[in-house]
């Protein structure tokens, strides 16, 4: 299937060990609900949520999706809790983190960090494990 122009391969990929575990990363994000400091920085927000202080090595979410697709790390269907959800909003690819049950958290297009139903943001999405291969 596809997220815009990206072809998605279904394959089992093991969870990645990040500096901050999934629940801690989600708590970090939920503690920032309402903050407008992350406007237009959804990729940086997710990278920092999972404990990476330095740049991810990707220019933006579109660059990340391209890299993840090339490495066959994208999946379709309902994203599990803690997965990164890559979605089309307007003319850009954005990223948020799955809370499970179709909800995501992150700096959304409207500005502040929020919790939203993914279906209200986009019907064109894929997900990946929280993988930042170039982060430190």
Predicted segments, located by residue:
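Aromatic- and glycine-rich peptidoglycan recognition patches
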Residues: 9-15, 26-34, 98-136
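Secreted/periplasmic proteins that engage bacterial cell-wall peptidoglycan
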Residues: 1-90
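Generic detector of ordered, mature protein regions
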Residues: 58-67, 92, 97-98, 111, ...
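Structural recognition of the beta-strand scaffold that forms the well-ordered cores
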Residues: 82-87, 95-98, 104-106
């Amino acid at each position: 299937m596809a997220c815009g122009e990206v072809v998605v391969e279904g394959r089992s990929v093991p969870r990645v060990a990040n500096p901050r575990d999934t629940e801690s990363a989600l708590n970090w994000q939920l503690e920032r609900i309402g903050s407008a400091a992350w406007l237009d920085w959804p990729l940086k927000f997710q990278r920092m949520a999972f404990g990476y202080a330095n740049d991810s090595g990707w220019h933006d979410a579109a660059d990340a999706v391209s890299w993840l697709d090339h490495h066959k790390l994208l999946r379709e269907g309902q994203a599990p809790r803690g997965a990164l959800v890559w979605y089309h909003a307007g003319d850009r690819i954005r990223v948020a983190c799955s809370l499970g049950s179709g909800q995501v958290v992150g700096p959304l297009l409207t500005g502040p960090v929020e919790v939203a139903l993914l279906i209200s943001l986009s019907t064109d999405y894929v997900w990946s494990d929280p993988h930042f291969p170039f982060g430190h």
